[in-house]
């Protein structure tokens, strides 16, 4: 089975995951009761969807098949995915389409900014596909989107979730210089899984990227997330936490991997809520300012509320250090 989807133009059918078509179908495990969600039907959801379509925007909520879309869109929260809906990578877990991307939409920064203002967002999350085809990996486009939002909605805090800018010298520095409030780059999984789960990326490059953000701007909040249920061992997750703390990462998110189609990496296990709580406790003991760990945790879920708590946690830490 190969999924076909186009959320903006339903008539433009295309193979979504051509690189996975040759793979044998894998069994999709039945979800336990603790990760069941209701279908989105609310008025708020419909209004958010209408704004997204009006401005011809792409959201990771739709493209990645996020289970929290109903809850977030009902509250007028959305994570905008810039630089198109086609990614140059082919991660085994991801539902975003793979292929040759289109040219950048030069009107996109202004369109995103208009949507942010229209939705009255106090906090916005901007992510993107990987654009290995671009000389700077899309750094300039990130910069333009941040600037446009600042101009249209100055009070809105901005969180970015970036690709790894692998082999793109100067790209990270350009994005950090644009001064987002939160810089998020997801590790996704433990290093032992990278060859099968995230083959186009390099674990220690991603760790170094997060570390470099703090070197460039020590005041910038950094954030990273992983999925569990991909066959990792507990000790591997704890080592990853240590690696992130070595890079001075402030905020860690941990959520359950959910298999998009039979062609994607299979779910090896459903991690229990108690185990997620245990990971949260350990992560706090290692020094993270904020930890979100639950089956339905995703990078942008409750991002606005979490940002307020993140700021409060830093202020508390600074006050305690001054005493």
UniProtKB/Swiss-Prot annotation:
Its EC number is 2.8.1.8. One of its GO terms (molecular function) is lipoate synthase activity. Residues 73-289 form the Radical SAM core domain. Transmembrane segments: none annotated. Pfam families: LIAS_N (PF16881), Radical_SAM (PF04055). Its cofactor is [4Fe-4S] cluster. [4Fe-4S] cluster 2 binds at residues 87, 91, 94. NCBIfam families: lipA, PRK05481.1, PRK12928.1. Pathway: Protein modification; protein lipoylation via endogenous pathway; protein N(6)-(lipoyl)lysine from octanoyl-[acyl-carrier-protein]: step 2/2. One of its GO terms (cellular component) is cytoplasm. Binds 2 [4Fe-4S] clusters per subunit. One cluster is coordinated with 3 cysteines and an exchangeable S-adenosyl-L-methionine. InterPro entries: Aldolase_TIM, Elp3/MiaA/NifB-like_rSAM, LIAS_N, Lipoyl_synth, rSAM. CDD domains: Radical_SAM (cd01335). HAMAP family: Lipoyl_synth (MF_00206). It is found in: Cytoplasm. It comes from the Bacteria. The gene is lipA. Belongs to the radical SAM superfamily. Lipoyl synthase family. Keywords: 4Fe-4S, Cytoplasm, Iron, Iron-sulfur, Metal-binding, S-adenosyl-L-methionine, Transferase. It is an enzyme of class 2 (transferase). It catalyses: [[Fe-S] cluster scaffold protein carrying a second [4Fe-4S](2+) cluster] + N(6)-octanoyl-L-lysyl-[protein] + 2 oxidized [2Fe-2S]-[ferredoxin] + 2 S-adenosyl-L-methionine + 4 H(+) = [[Fe-S] cluster scaffold protein] + N(6)-[(R)-dihydrolipoyl]-L-lysyl-[protein] + 4 Fe(3+) + 2 hydrogen sulfide + 2 5'-deoxyadenosine + 2 L-methionine + 2 reduced [2Fe-2S]-[ferredoxin]. This is Lipoyl synthase.
């Amino acid at each position: 089975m190969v999924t076909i989807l186009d959320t903006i133009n339903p008539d433009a059918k295309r193979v979504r995951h051509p690189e996975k078509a040759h793979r044998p179908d894998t069994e999709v495990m039945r979800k336990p009761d603790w990760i069941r969600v209701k279908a989105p039907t609310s008025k708020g959801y419909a209004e958010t969807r209408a704004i997204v379509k009006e401005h011809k925007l792409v959201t990771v909520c739709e493209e990645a098949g996020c289970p929290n879309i109903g809850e977030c869109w009902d509250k007028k929260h959305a994570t905008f995915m810039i630089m198109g809906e086609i990614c140059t990578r082919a991660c085994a877990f991801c539902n975003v389409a793979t292929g040759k991307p289109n040219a950048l939409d030069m009107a996109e920064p202004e369109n995103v900014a208009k949507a942010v203002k229209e939705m009255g967002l106090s906090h916005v999350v901007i992510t993107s596909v990987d654009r290995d085809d671009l000389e700077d990996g899309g750094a300039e486009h990130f910069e333009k989107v941040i600037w446009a939002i600042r101009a249209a909605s100055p009070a809105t805090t901005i969180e970015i979730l970036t690709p790894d800018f692998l082999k793109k010298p100067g790209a990270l520095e350009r994005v950090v210089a644009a001064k987002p409030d939160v810089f998020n780059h997801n590790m996704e999984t433990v290093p032992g899984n990278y060859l099968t789960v995230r083959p186009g990326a390099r674990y220690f490059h991603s760790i170094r990227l997060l570390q470099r953000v703090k070197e460039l701007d020590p005041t910038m909040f950094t954030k990273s997330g992983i999925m569990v249920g991909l066959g990792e061992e507990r000790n591997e997750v704890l080592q990853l936490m240590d690696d992130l703390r070595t890079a001075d990462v402030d905020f860690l998110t941990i959520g359950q991997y959910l298999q998009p189609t039979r062609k994607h990496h299979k779910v090896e296990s459903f991690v229990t809520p108690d185990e997620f709580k245990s990971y949260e406790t350990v992560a706090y003991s290692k020094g993270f300012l904020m930890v979100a760990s639950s089956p339905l945790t995703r990078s942008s879920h409750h991002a606005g509320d979490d940002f307020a708590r993140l700021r409060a946690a830093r202020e508390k830490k600074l006050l305690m250090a001054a005493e």
